Design a protein with these regions (language model features):
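Beta-strand elements of well-folded, non-transmembrane domains
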Residues: 87-89, 103-105, 138-140, 163-165
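A broad, low-specificity signal marking well-ordered, structured residues that form hydrophobic/aromatic
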Residues: 45, 97, 116
Length: 185
């Protein structure tokens, strides 16, 4: 890859810019040698999201119903998403369920995806299944603006399971954006 020739070591911007193709799996649009979260198994897995989620959520309701976190909105629970993982091969293996959020919400440029939760399942035998619960908070859905504030934006979201992905589910956040955490200025 010629990535190292494209980015100055002095440029610390994560987001893509005029002379920067973007850093990390969230922003880089080129072809990676190994994608973030890449792993090899001696078997094949399939996944199915078994949690029934709403199609739409009002941001005001999500933030108003959060009383259990001592006023820290970013810690508010959003959803506990159950993912049934099946070992479709013959070899016993562990599996790490990676939950990413993707979508074009908030100001451009938009990250390709963001890792928001993961869970390792141990020793899934061939032909067997196990369930991973991915716990999402409002911070899982938020983006950090240029001032360092965590903001929950309205828009269309997709929860992706694994890199390919093996499963996905879509939902929409509606209403006005909400500041979850303000960075000291």
């Amino acid at each position: 890859s010629n990535y190292i020739a494209k980015v100055s070591m002095m440029d610390m911007n994560m987001r893509p810019g005029e002379n920067n193709p973007g850093r990390t799996y969230k922003w880089y649009n080129g072809s990676a040698v190994y994608e973030f979260g890449h792993g090899l198994h001696y078997t094949n897995f399939s996944a199915n999201i078994t949690t029934q989620m709403q199609n739409s959520y009002a941001i005001s309701a999500l933030t108003q119903n959060c009383n259990s976190t001592g006023g820290f909105l970013e810690r508010c629970p959003f959803a506990a998403v159950d993912v049934e993982v099946s070992n479709d091969g013959d070899v016993t293996s562990d599996y790490v369920a990676l939950g990413y959020i993707a979508g074009e919400f908030g100001p451009a440029p938009h990250p390709k995806k963001s890792l928001v939760s993961y869970k390792r399942l141990h020793n899934i035998t061939g032909g067997a299944s196990d369930t991973a619960t991915l716990n999402l908070t409002l911070a899982s859905l938020a983006r950090v603006d240029e001032m360092g504030n965590k903001v929950l934006y309205p828009g269309d979201y997709t929860l992706l399971i694994d890199n390919h992905p093996l499963a996905s589910i879509n939902f929409t956040l509606t209403g006005e954006q909400a500041m979850l955490d303000m960075w000291p200025q």
